[in-house]
Amino acid sequence: MALKSYKPTTPGQRGLVLIDRSELWKGRPVKSLTEGLTKNGGRNNTGRITMRRKGGGAKRLYRIVDFKRTKFDVSATVERIEYDPNRTAFIALIKYEDGEQAYILAPQRLAVGDKVIAGAKVDVKPGNAMPFSGMPIGTIVHNVELKPGKGGQIARSAGTYAQFVGRDGGYAQIRLSSGELRLVRQECMATIGAVSNSDHSNQNFGKAGRNRHKGIRPSVRGVAMNPIDHPHGGGEGRTSGGRHPVTPWGKGTKGTRTRSNKSTDKYILRSRHAKKKGR
């Protein structure tokens, strides 16, 4: 899908660049594949804000997307490509030969009428899914499982992909778009191709209201707050803060590493930080 820019007929149109979604399905989603979605405004079950800058926005229906692809050796036809408000990628409605319908993440170059299939060893075509054990090395994949049978967790957002670069014992080596080199079990499933809507990051919404429609609220700078609200707050006039930039809870906010999951460190062969200068 291409980008669409607008003439500056109003201040909100000036600089506006959106994805051209004219080729997507214009009707409602399949009702049996949707669920209601309750807004929580970034609050948890105790009512406290656990995710800042969230709230409001247009009402959404949740589309049930098949991230597992466990229906092996049954061919399916792509009925249509749809917009999904709950993710940055587009989704594809597929219909299996036995009549069952499902939503999957739409990869790039997947078109209406194409056939897709999941199995132990299938053709290397966008939309087909198989475990790494039957996949040729060098394949570009998305929707990668971290645990066999759990469903894809890696490379699901618009334009992302991982590359299958080698085998190591019972593990597959994959290179992620962040530069990280990581091991996953060879029984883990992955879908061929890169995720659709790669131009998503090149959009310019033109006005604050478009972000509000998406449920994104304004982000207030720490230096504009009072000392009670933020470590950067307070001071007469504009102040530099006098310390390294931190979050409201005092953790470094510009690249300080806070990852503490040591049990899975052994699966990371090369850190995503390794390519950075001086590290």
From Swiss-Prot:
Keywords tagged on the record: Ribonucleoprotein, Ribosomal protein, RNA-binding, rRNA-binding
GO cellular component term of the entry, any: large ribosomal subunit
Instruction: Give any single GO term for biological process.
Output: cytoplasmic translation
Question: Compositional bias (Basic residues) spans?
Answer: 269-279
Looking at the keywords, is Plastid present?
Answer: no
Note the InterPro entries from the entry.
Answer: NA-bd_OB-fold (IPR012340), Rib_uL2_dom2 (IPR014722), Ribosomal_uL2 (IPR002171), Ribosomal_uL2_bac/org-type (IPR005880), Ribosomal_uL2_C (IPR022669), Ribosomal_uL2_CS (IPR022671), Ribosomal_uL2_dom3 (IPR014726), Ribosomal_uL2_RNA-bd_dom (IPR022666)
For this protein, the record's Pfam families field holds:
Ribosomal_L2, Ribosomal_L2_C
Region of interest called Disordered, as start-end residue ranges on this chain: 223-279
SMART domains given for it? Ribosomal_L2, Ribosomal_L2_C
Q: Does the keyword Acetylation apply?
A: no
GO MF term (any one)? structural constituent of ribosome
Function comment: One of the primary rRNA binding proteins. Required for association of the 30S and 50S subunits to form the 70S ribosome, for tRNA binding and peptide bond formation. It has been suggested to have peptidyltransferase activity; this is somewhat controversial. Makes several contacts with the 16S rRNA in the 70S ribosome.
Protein family: Belongs to the universal ribosomal protein uL2 family.
Subunit-structure text: Part of the 50S ribosomal subunit. Forms a bridge to the 30S subunit in the 70S ribosome.
Listed name of the protein: Large ribosomal subunit protein uL2
What is the originating organism of this protein? Paracoccus denitrificans (strain Pd 1222)
Name the encoding gene, please: rplB
